[in-house]
Amino acid sequence: MKKIFISALVALCGFTASYAQQASFLSNNHCLYRISQESQNQKCLLLPVQENAEMANIKVIADNKQVKAFNVKLAKDHVDYFVPLYMDEFAGLKGLALDIHVNGDYNKEGLNALTCWKEMKFSDAFDMKNREQYRPDFHHTPAYGWMNDPNGLFYKDGVWNLYFQYNPYGSQWENMTWGHSTSTDLVHWKFQGTPIQPDAVGTIFSGSAVVDKNNTSGFGKDAVVALYTSAAENQTQSMAYSTDNGKTFTKYEGNPIITSTVPDFRDPHMFWNEGIKKWNMILAAGQHMEIYSSDNLKDWKYESSFGEKYGNHGGVWECPDLMKMKVRGTDKEKWMLICNINPGGPFGGSATQYFVGDFDGHKFTCDSKPEVTKWMDYGKDHYATVTFDNAPEGRRVAIAWMSNWQYANQVPTQQYRSGNSIPRDLGLFEYKGETYCSVVPSPEMTAARSKKAGKKLTESCEMVVNLKGNATITLSNDKGEKVVMNYDAKAETFSMDRTKSGKMDFSKDFAAVTKAPTYGNISQLRIFIDKSSIEALDADGKMAMTNLVFPSKPYNKVTVKGKGKYQVYDIK
């Protein structure tokens, strides 16, 4: 029936491939935008976006069938930015057209008058030159479009692979796809495209990837195998595999491989468990985690669940991770379960909590009492934390989404939205009878420093503060905007006040003072400043705090009250 309808639609508009591209208006909300064969030879069709416009639902038709579908806020009366629809996706196809339904109350003449029709244009290039004052220099960001959770992190052959929740057709959440970037140093990243795109099973939500060294899946030795959530009416788990180091993926013909009617059933994270010689997977299901095992990554056995009555339950549990690590200064090894939660964070919105205990491949047992909640980062803007598979030397390298669901869609950027945290190496330490997660900047951040240190604050730098007792650190600019950080040695707390940091009117939830326990004294703070973010970490790993800031001008002044001394390194 769909094929007959599309054929009739094309015939109604008098469409042939020889016509120049044009819009034919079929009803108050319906248009067919035809693309000539000549135009298909160009690189991309630039779609004009207006962020406060109604959503348009676009189906790409070729050879009398639907080959792609996505949503975009086509410009109504002005253009905020353009996004590309790349023509190479449709190479060799004929009869290409966009079947467009624009939501909203339009008469036929009103639809015809929208700005988008005259602004759509073909181009042999898409300009990715940065136009944003707040885009960071040494944090990963998408060149354009929206990004949230990091996904499918793995290391192979000297390359760090970062996939991420991505909207290629706008800078707000929509059209969930896996974007892909690579790096050789965890600091400088190169965008590699969108290797896992939505399909008939659903849009592509969060998941993980592993290097299958022993070919347990049958996809080939050292194949990269990804599990992700297919989001449709229900959320199910699907698989894709790569035999070219993660550049391209083939979706498994047996998808979905795990189904459920449970809402919020998502974000599979898998890893090889040497203790049981099997794969384990941890999966978020509402407000608890489910644990599975497998011999081949395709067939999964339910083992147990964890989380009822443990930790914070102020929101949905998401983006889990589970890993074994040594406890600093002891001969102990413990397992840590990461559980991202939204809402329910210590200062509102989203945050990363974790649990420490034992895991035998079948069941996770938490060491702490159920009412104990531990946070990995005490800022407002650190979420969806996950680690890289196959990291060298047994390291547990983590990256997070650097934003908060309370305002992520409204922050004052348009070309792109959201970045990732700096990479951090995780570990464990003991303090007063509890075991906590240690978080330190990855050594790659030290390697990125300039050779010489100075006192001048720049908009993208690392500030190292050596402390001897209480200290107050203030970053400010000529506009009077400032961020105040305070360390109280006696109380064992560190706080950051961004209530006068700059632009805040985009959300009532942005202004905040965040406060963290330090689990003992801090002798050195490492503060990473990168245009629109401040990450403060104890050099020994006992405290981490991440907050976004949007000063109208860069902070160019620093004062340290107390006995602390500081140095500033540029990050290259």
Model-derived features: where do they sit?
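Beta-propeller domains
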Residues: 55-64, 141, 157-158, 162-194
